[in-house]
Amino acid sequence: MDDVSQRPLLAAALAAFGRPAAIIDLETTGGSFDTDRITEIAFLRFDGGTVTPYHSLVHPERPIPPFIRRLTGIGDETVAGAPPFSALAHELLPLLRGCILLAHNSKFDYTFLRRAFARCGLPFAAPTLCTVQLSRSLYPQFYKHSLESIIERHGIAAASRHRAADDVLAVADYLETALREQGAETFAAHAHHLLQPKLPPALPAALEEQLYALSDGCGALLWLDESGRPLHLAAHRHAFSEAARRLAASEQARAAASLRFLPAAGPLHALTLKAQLAAEYGLRPSENPQHAAAQQDFLTVRLRSGENGCVQAKLERLSDGRFAEQPYGLFPNKKAARQALVEWARGNGLCPQRLDILPDGYSRDTPCPAALSGGCACLSDGLEAHNRRTAAAARLLPVAGWGRAHALEITETDADTGVQLSFACSGGALHLPDGSWYFDHSLPALIKEKFKKERHNIRVCV
């Protein structure tokens, strides 16, 4: 690859970000993040006044399809002697970790790169700047923003297309041209707006190092102060991106001294790890506010013994946290809960008066209205028998968003490492390995999403 020190405008613009930046391009065996692999990697790394080029073919450890060979010129024989990504990973990681990655369609290159590192057991994450979006933002008068269109529009000399090294140089030349045409101030404004995630202000060296050592996948992240006391705890789907956004937006977050991260196979696993960290540090939900004003309140049913020894169904707010006893049912509001309780009692032949779920307007001393019609359990069951049937039927209380299901086994698989874990959920809560139950305000929406998108990973137990 050419020395690009002749691109002074680009070098200055990237230096203004205050951290290294790399213009990167990958060639792959196809477009699937799950099944395709990298065949070529190239980048230009800008760090202050130094520009470091890198290029390598990569053995994908699978056949290269004919279409890709025709498109890129890279076939099986081209990569026959090339190293697999696993042999390059430890060389690449220190060059790219902590960099801003610029790429034409950055989601493609970033995701392939992140997942290639993950398959090697190496967490990798980076802020990204998509040069397709940057072209659209800087040149809105044009309709096409593919690299071919940009090369033609700006008269950029390109030795070939769909080869990583040549594409990197073409993107670098385009950015230098855009800086010359638009000016550094305009370029910087658009670039900073499009950068994802936004960069936090200057951080203590140790905290910055820990931030850039995070993965951009699922996990539980604990923020600690200088004394090792917990400041904030959250489960994440994209740990690095979400942590960086928090640091950019919150001065309080920037007061953290260190981070502790537990990677997860999926979002349910992340919630169990969040529960684990909360227990380890003795952190109560009230000490870890998670935008409580925006959270939906959920209700559940707890079985409580009344004055006469009769088991009653009591509606209670289901708060985030760990519980010794299982919650029964999950309801978005009191109206839905009361209606569900009445239908549940009727369907299971239980007495609404004994359960203390009579509608408003009925006092406890009022004769059971169901008994007056001659069809209530209080006419046939003794108290102990009714209590036993109530306890047995409690698991059949409905759960919002689960349809007719009451208890589930949900499997999560890490697509990169192959780690597979199963989780028991019942009554709207997670059953933890120690026998306790855990609820988080994000859990109902998460399981509803899994019903919609991952039904094949759910086994309905009850």
Model features per residue range: what roles?
Residues M1-A126, P140-H162:
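Conserved non-catalytic scaffold segment of RNase H-like nuclease domains
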Residues M1-A13, E176-L221, D225-S227:
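Acidic two-metal-ion nuclease catalytic site recognized across multiple nuclease folds
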Residues P65, S86-A89, K144, A165-V168, ...:
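Amphipathic alpha-helical transducer elements in NTP-driven molecular machines
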Residues G73, L92, L102, D167, ...:
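A residue-level signal for conserved active-site and pocket-lining positions in enzyme catalytic cores
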Residues A126-S135:
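A short, structured active-site edge motif that brings together acidic residues
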Residues R163-T177:
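Acidic, divalent-metal-coordinating active-site segment for phosphoryl/phosphodiester hydrolysis
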Residues P204-V462:
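Conserved catalytic/ligand-binding micro-motifs in nucleotide and anionic cofactor chemistry
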